[in-house]
């Protein structure tokens, strides 16, 4: 019953559905029946769309696929290896090392990131940073977003360059985790944003 209610909410009120399915792929093929009555109710009452709610009631909510907030979103792919940046199923609220894992053939929350207009590689509330306490290993960690420069990156020539250290994001095949390394001409440092608004 809860599944059907969520589906009705999504179809009746939400204007974007892709992000919904990313977090609840189990509902993608749920049969919900005719919802025309609900859509007519919304139109008849002049109900505002979900975007209005985000802009007027909850403006501090980060929307990971909205071009108002992001330059790109989706999988961040290393084309040479076919691997993607991955949370390795870690929880958003936890601090953890970012993984480097074969890209899924389907949308997956563990490989969904956005590159914000503020220069953050981020999930909903966590941002990629270089663990300065681990400069020997140069691991890249997800930590709560704080707006500080330690979480800022530039995306130039398909490279993510950390603003403070000038190190590049690197994925090594056979390595479980991402790292940062001195920038060089190497396919291990090239990345594609799956949905890049700047390329559109």
Predicted regions and their residues:
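Lectin-like carbohydrate-binding module/patch detector with strong preference for beta-trefoil
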Residues: 62-200
């Amino acid at each position: 019953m809860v599944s059907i209610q969520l589906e009705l909410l999504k179809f009746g009120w939400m204007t974007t559905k892709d992000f919904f399915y990313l977090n609840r792929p189990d509902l993608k093929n749920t049969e919900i029946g005719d919802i025309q009555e609900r859509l007519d109710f919304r139109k008849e009452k002049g109900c505002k769309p979900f975007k209005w709610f985000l802009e007027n009631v909850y403006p501090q909510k980060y929307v990971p696929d909205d071009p108002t907030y992001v330059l790109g979103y989706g999988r961040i792919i290393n084309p040479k290896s076919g691997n993607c940046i991955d949370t390795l199923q870690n929880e958003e609220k936890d601090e953890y090392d970012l993984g480097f894992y074969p890209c899924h053939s389907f949308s997956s929350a563990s490989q969904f990131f956005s590159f914000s207009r503020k220069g953050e590689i981020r999930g909903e509330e966590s941002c990629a940073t270089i663990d300065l306490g681990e400069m020997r290993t140069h691991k890249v960690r997800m930590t709560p977003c704080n707006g500080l420069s330690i979480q800022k990156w530039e995306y130039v020539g398909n490279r993510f360059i950390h603003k403070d250290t000038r190190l590049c994001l690197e994925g090594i095949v056979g390595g479980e985790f991402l790292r940062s390394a001195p920038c060089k001409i190497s396919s291990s440092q090239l990345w594609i944003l799956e949905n890049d608004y700047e390329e559109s």
